[in-house]
């Protein structure tokens, strides 16, 4: 299925019971899709992201982001998942700060990306978030 270009599932994802993926979905490393999560066709789910139970994902989800609801809304950073993967507390705090820049300050995507890029030297994992944002077409709750 995946070798024919119908979608991409990378490694080490957790797909809980009754998670449904439509065609051409891409799921990044260490993403967790909780029970009864629905993912619309052509959506991309970023690395280390998390969906709450019963979430309906109709747009792309950036790396590290926790989404919940129907339709899905970005809620916070997947801090618990990051701790389990060995991320340091300081790095998780900086990713939270990056999330707030992206989702809570009312900035356009271009301005938010500029601010995030200034944080990469101190917190290299923010580059993963930036890269995922640049690859996504339609994503959650950002101007």
Give the residues covered by each predicted segment.
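Terminal amphipathic alpha-helical/low-complexity segments used for targeting or macromolecular assembly
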Residues: 1, 64, 70-143
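Single conserved hydrophobic/aromatic residue that forms the stacking wall/gate
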Residues: 1-10
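Glycine-rich beta-solenoid repeat tracts in large extracellular/virion proteins
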Residues: 4, 20-21
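Conserved SAM/SAH cofactor-binding pocket of Class I
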Residues: 5, 25-26, 38-39, 43
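Right-handed parallel beta-helix
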Residues: 11-18, 28-30, 47-48
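Residues that scaffold the ATP/ADP-binding catalytic core of kinase and kinase-like folds
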Residues: 24, 60, 76
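Helix-turn-helix DNA-binding module
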Residues: 24-32, 112
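A contiguous pocket-lining binding segment that forms or flanks enzyme active sites
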Residues: 32-66
């Amino acid at each position: 299925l995946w070798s024919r270009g119908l979608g991409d599932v990378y490694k080490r994802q957790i797909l809980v019971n009754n998670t449904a993926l439509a065609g051409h979905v891409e799921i990044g490393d260490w993403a967790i899709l909780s029970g009864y999560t629905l993912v619309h066709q052509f959506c991309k789910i970023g690395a280390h992201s998390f969906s709450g139970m019963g979430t309906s994902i109709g747009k792309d989800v950036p790396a590290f982001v926790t989404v919940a609801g129907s339709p899905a809304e970005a809620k916070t950073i997947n801090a618990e998942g990051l701790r389990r993967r060995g991320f340091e507390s300081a790095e998780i705090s900086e990713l939270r700060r990056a999330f707030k820049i992206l989702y809570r300050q009312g900035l356009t995507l271009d301005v938010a990306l500029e601010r995030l890029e200034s944080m990469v030297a101190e917190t290299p994992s923010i580059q993963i978030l930036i890269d995922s944002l640049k690859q996504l077409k339609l994503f959650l709750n950002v101007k």
